[in-house]
């Protein structure tokens, strides 16, 4: 069940990961989160900002950690919130924990301006 979330952020499940992420034509930022995760509430507005800023060059998906153990294991997510920037099956960037707006934008600029 693909649903649009705030400003172009798509909520996906393990079952949709291959289609929505691995087969995407553009880079994909995967945001792993949980409803019980306080720091995730700090990251969510930054994810929405990234969608607004880079939506023409970047696909952004969010995955709730608990119901999606396959992606969590495959991408070695050990803490939340976590971000994985992928192009196809290649992980370009990997972060865990809250990062600043400047760090997020810098990380994305580094990869998206080289397209």
Where do the protein language model's features map onto the residues?
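Thiol-based oxidoreductase modules, predominantly thioredoxin-like and allied folds used
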Residues: 12, 32, 44-51, 55-69
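A short beta-strand-turn-helix
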Residues: 9-27, 69
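Short pre-active-site segment immediately N-terminal to redox-active cysteine/selenocysteine motifs
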Residues: 25-26, 33-36, 79
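The canonical Cys-X-X-Cys-His
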Residues: 37-40, 83
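N-terminal targeting signals for export/organelle localization
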Residues: 1-8, 49, 113-115
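Non-catalytic, surface beta->alpha helical segment in thiol-disulfide oxidoreductase systems
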Residues: 79, 84-115
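A short glycine-leucine-enriched loop at secondary-structure breakpoints
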Residues: 74-78
